[in-house]
Amino acid sequence: MEKRIAFWFCVLCATLSGYAQSSSLQDYVTSVRAKSCAPVDYVFKLFEHSDIVVIGERDHRDTTQYELILDILRDARFAEDIGYVYTEVGCVNRTKDVNRLLQGKYKTAQAFNDALYAYLRNEDFNPLWDKYNRVQFLRGLYEINRSNRHKITLGLTDCKFSWNKIKTAQEYRDFDDSPACAYRDSTMSLHFAEMYPKQKPKNGKRKALIITNHPHALNATFAGKDYHRQGKWLKELYGEDNVKIVMLNCTEYIQKEQMPLVASGLWDAAFEVMGCQPFGMDIKETPFGREPYFNARYGDLKWEDIADGIIYYKPIYELVLTIGIPGIVSIDFEVELMRRIRIYFEAMDRPVPPLEEAKPMYDRFLSFPGTYPQSPHSVRDTILRLMKE
């Protein structure tokens, strides 16, 4: 009898504990009001006590996030006190090329644009990188450097690659199957670790901002596998408190006709209550931090396990996904594009498209809502309903 009573007492305690841990909309709102500040100020606040800040980028195609990133870089404190930014996008062996581009002098805007496109055609191991925000980012960074006495240096961290050295589909397969590609998080961490000590200290310190996609930024390891994400590697290399990981607000994943909102939409509802005013905040020991992380592949983790903070910038229904770089496939580049297309598509065991189909894949400008496949209105209606419940 005593054992039975003890058993049901444990069940009751576990149930009550679950209720105590669940967070209401008001809990999230209260937390934001108590702990948050403007996103740009939040990033520089992190740099006061840590040398490396990692921003977990949302969908690679989103252009709105680069408005914020450029605001951070445009702040005078960045060039004067930090000076170095690193990105996932871009093959490491193109780092010198990109800095010649960004710190060069051009007589006209068209002259810079020509140099930018010539560089972009060789930056990536895909036939071309089609995300328009790369143009947005590099053009913005060039303008910052052009008008600033203190120059910002860009480091590229992705796999070493050159299209000039790839002649066959088998050679591309060998690259794609290489350990460097299979363990890209380790590769990008290694490349950063090679460049970081070479930085010129600013005010006696080396500091760096790293921009990498959300999954890479995680302070996590795949459950049951010896595969660290980039954020995990960086914290192990440079110290838990010396590396701060911040995630931009995002959705969970795409699944058929749905794009689930984090915490069943309560986060987004809290942002809406706050008037969608951008903010950044630490999440440890907050309702945000206690929220279970949505990807079970990493085990039973909470948000405070995988990141140190969050930045809310733009509601989900205002995100803009843009692909295609108009003019990137010039007439002079068409032959080289088709050479790459044949190699790449054969290596991936896919039918090789003709030029009239291949060219628009990269230079046709196309924008669509960040809520795709749902409409922005339906997502906003879902959030507004949560506010009324």
Language model segments and positions:
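Structured catalytic-domain cores with a bias toward divalent-metal coordination
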Residues: Y19-E389
